[in-house]
UniProtKB/Swiss-Prot annotation:
Record keywords, A-Z: Ribonucleoprotein, Ribosomal protein
UniProt cross-references to PANTHER family, sorted A to Z: 60S RIBOSOMAL PROTEIN L18, LARGE RIBOSOMAL SUBUNIT PROTEIN EL18
Claim: Ribonucleoprotein is one of the keywords in the record: yes
Protein name per the record: Large ribosomal subunit protein eL18
Gene3D superfamilies in the record: 3.100.10.10
Superkingdom, natural source: Archaea
Entry's family note: Belongs to the eukaryotic ribosomal protein eL18 family.
Protein's gene: rpl18e
Cystines in this chain: none
Length: 120
């Protein structure tokens, strides 16, 4: 079978945007995130809030090339950028004083991608 990639038009647009920003800024992190988002849905990252809590500290910035799910609890303030958030995950992140943002917003804030943790 021929590999077609994601069929969601918004995801395809995001992947093109990530590749463009990677070339413009000369930063490989955005190309890596684009590659991870391009994988089949069943191989895409699904990260629980508890994992974010376990592997980050106060003030970290995390990018999830997939979905953030609401299992567990978050005990410190972090900025989380992802393709999708569940409602409970968004609620738990904001209640902890953090932010749940889109990947595009993260690129606008930090075009060089410095200090960003990729979590899968």
């Amino acid at each position: 079978m021929k590999r077609t990639g994601p069929t969601d038009i918004n995801l395809r647009r995001l992947i093109r945007y990530l590749r463009k920003k990677s070339n413009e800024e000369g930063v490989k992190i955005w190309k890596d995130i684009a590659w991870r988002l391009e994988r089949p849905r069943r191989q895409r990252a699904e990260v629980n809030v508890s994992k974010i809590n376990r592997y980050t500290k106060e003030g970290d910035t995390v990018i999830v090339p997939g979905s953030v799910l609401g299992a567990g609890k978050l005990e410190h303030k972090v900025v989380v950028a992802a393709w999708k958030f569940s409602e409970t995950a968004k609620k738990k992140i904001t209640e902890a004083g953090g932010e749940a943002i889109t990947i595009e917003e993260l690129i606008e804030r930090n075009p060089k991608g410095s200090g960003v943790i990729i979590m899968e």
